[in-house]
Design a protein with these regions (language model features):
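Low-complexity, glycine/alanine/valine/leucine- and proline-rich hydrophobic stretches
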Residues: 287-317, 367-414
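C-terminal interaction segments
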Residues: 309, 324-330, 337, 390-452
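A generic short-segment signal for beta-strand/edge and adjacent turn/coil regions
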Residues: 43-47, 58-62, 74, 333-338, ...
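Non-heme di-metal
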Residues: 2-333, 379, 443, 449
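Intrinsically disordered, low-complexity segments enriched in small/polar residues
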Residues: 14-17, 356, 381, 388, ...
Length: 452
C-alpha cells in the first residue's frame, strides 16, 4: 500500500477511545488521503452493533412527542433501508476496483454497511418494536420511502448490474459518484448531522446516539475513499470526467427531491429543531467541499449539472430549490405545476444558467409565451446568458404553450414532438435555432429540450 499521510501516533491521539471528535477525513483534498490511512482508520474505529444497550433508549423513545416518533420513523427508515441496499450492492464495486488497495478498503466498507444495517435493525426491533427479523424490519420501512429516495436507490441497483458487465474506469467513476458522493455525502451525511445533533443535546437515547456517532465516523471514512478515488480518476481521464457529469445530470431530479416529508408537513423536521432550508443548505455546503477536495469544484462543471448560482448564499439557494419543489416544478408529479411571478423568476434563472453558451456562434434569444402565465425570454450573447421577464423585442424562437404543459415537457419528460402534434406546444421562428436547442440545453435538463 502507499505510505500513510498520518502517523500511527497522530491517528491514535486524534481518535481517542471511540473515535468521536476525530478530524473529518472526507473534507481533505484527495492528494492528502491515502488508502493505507483509510484502512488503518477502519481497524482502529471498529465497533460492535451488539455491544449497544438499548434499554434506556426504549424509555427515551416513549418520551418523544407523537410527531417526533412519526418523524423518526420516516428518517430512520431511509437509513435502515439504505444501509441494507448498499451492503447488497458493494460486491461489483470490489470486483471493478482497478487497485488492490481499493478492493481491500471496499471490502471493509461492505462490513461497515452490514454492521450499520444490524444497528438499525436492533433499534427498530428493540426500541420501536418494528420487525423481528431483518426482512420484516425492511418491509416496515418501504412505505415510508419517498419518490426521490426510490429514484436514487433504484439507480444504485441498475448501476450494480452495469458494473458487473462493464468494469471500465468511466463506469467505475460513475459508480463511486453515485455511492460515495450522492448517497453517502449528499443524502446520508446531512441527515446524520441533524439527527446526531438533536439526540446528543437531548441525551435521552444514549445507545442510539453512540451508534449514530459510529455510523457517521464510518461514513466520513467512506466518503474520504470516494474523494480519493475520484480525484485520481478525474485527473487522469477526461472520459471519466464526462461520465461523472452524465450521471450527475441524470440524478439531479431525484437528489433534489430527497428529504421531502410526507404531505409536505414541515413539522417532520421542525420537531427535531431544524428546518428543511437548513438541512438543504448544510448538504449543499458539505457536497461542495467534497467536489472541491476531489479537484473538480462545482463551479467548473458544465452548465446544467447544478443549475443554481454557486455565488448565491447556500441558504438562499436552498430556499429557491424548495420553492420549486413546493410549486411542483421539481420533484415527483403532483398535479398541475403552480405559477407565480416569483416561481417563474426562479425557474427561468435556472434555465438561463443551464444554457451551454458555446453552442451558438451569434446572439440568440429564445422566448416563452404562456397562455396562463407571464412571458419570459433568455438571451445568450458573447458567452453569457440571462433571463428577462416579459416579451422580447425580437426573439429568434418563440415557444407557445400553457405553463402547465410546458412544465410537463420540461420536468416530466412529455414528448415535445407529440405536444406539437397536439398543438399544445407551438414553436415559431428560426428552424435553425429550434434544431440547435438540444445543443444549447442538454436533453431532459430543466428546460425540457428533448432530442427527437
Amino acid at each position: 500500500m502507499e505510505s500513510s499521510t498520518a502517523t500511527h501516533s497522530e491517528t491514535t491521539s486524534a481518535q481517542g477511545s471511540n473515535g468521536a471528535g476525530r478530524e473529518d477525513i472526507s473534507s481533505r483534498p484527495g492528494a492528502q488521503i491515502s488508502y493505507e490511512d483509510l484502512y488503518r482508520r477502519w481497524e482502529q474505529g471498529n465497533w460492535k452493533a451488539y455491544d449497544l444497550d438499548f434499554s434506556q433508549d426504549k424509555v427515551g423513545w416513549e418520551s418523544l412527542t407523537d410527531m417526533q416518533r412519526k418523524s423518526g420513523l420516516w428518517l430512520y427508515s431511509m437509513f435502515f433501508y439504505g444501509e441494507d441496499a448498499v451492503t447488497d450492492g458493494l460486491s461489483p464495486y470490489i470486483d471493478a476496483a482497478p487497485k488492490e488497495e481499493q478492493k481491500y478498503f471496499l471490502a471493509t466498507q461492505q462490513v461497515d454497511e452490514a454492521r450499520h444495517a444490524v444497528f438499525f435493525h436492533r433499534f427498530f426491533k428493540e426500541v420501536i418494536g418494528a420487525g423481528d427479523t431483518l426482512a420484516e424490519g425492511l418491509a416496515f420501512t418501504e412505505p415510508l420511502l419517498d419518490w426521490g429516495y426510490r429514484g436514487v436507490f433504484g439507480r444504485l441497483e441498475t448501476m450494480c448490474d452495469e458494473l458487473r458487465a462493464d468494469r471500465s474506469l468511466p463506469k467505475f467513476a460513475q459508480a463511486i459518484t453515485l455511492y460515495h458522493l450522492i448517497i453517502e455525502a449528499s443524502m446520508a451525511q446531512p441527515g446524520q448531522h441533524f439527527i446526531e445533533d438533536f439526540f446528543i443535546k437531548a441525551g435521552n437515547m444514549p445507545a442510539f446516539s453512540e451508534g449514530m456517532r459510529n455510523v457517521a465516523r464510518d461514513e466520513q471514512r467512506h466518503i474520504g475513499f470516494g474523494v480519493k478515488v475520484l480525484s485520481e480518476l478525474l485527473e487522469e481521464s477526461e472520459e471519466c470526467r464526462a461520465a461523472v457529469v452524465e450521471l450527475l445530470r441524470e440524478m439531479l431530479p431525484y437528489l433534489t427531491s430527497v428529504f421531502i416529508p410526507p404531505d409536505w408537513d414541515e413539522e417532520y423536521t421542525r420537531c427535531y429543531g431544524f428546518t428543511m432550508e437548513e438541512i438543504f443548505a448544510w448538504g449543499m455546503k458539505s457536497v461542495e467541499m467534497k467536489w472541491k477536495a476531489i479537484g473538480y469544484p462545482m463551479q467548473e462543471m458544465p452548465a446544467g449539472v447544478y443549475p443554481f448560482d454557486p455565488a448565491m448564499p447556500h441558504e438562499e439557494r436552498a430556499s429557491r430549490q424548495l420553492k420549486l419543489l413546493r410549486a411542483g416544478i421539481l420533484g415527483p408529479p403532483n398535479g398541475p405545476a403552480k405559477s407565480s411571478p416569483e416561481i417563474q423568476e426562479i425557474y427561468f434563472d435556472v434555465v438561463a444558467k443551464s444554457a451551454n453558451t458555446e453552442a451558438v456562434d451569434k446572439p440568440v434569444t429564445v422566448q416563452w409565451k404562456f397562455s396562463d402565465a407571464d412571458p419570459w425570454h433568455v438571451v445568450i450573447d458573447n458567452g453569457s446568458s440571462r433571463a428577462v421577464q416579459g416579451e422580447a423585442e425580437k426573439a429568434d424562437l418563440t415557444l407557445k404553450a400553457s405553463w402547465a404543459d410546458w412544465i410537463e415537457i420540461a420536468m416530466r419528460g412529455e414528448s415535445p414532438g407529440k405536444m406539437v402534434l397536439r398543438r399544445r406546444l407551438r414553436p415559431r421562428g428560426s428552424l435553425r435555432v429550434l434544431r440547435r436547442l438540444p445543443e444549447i440545453w442538454e436533453p431532459r435538463e430543466i428546460t425540457g429540450v428533448v432530442a427527437e
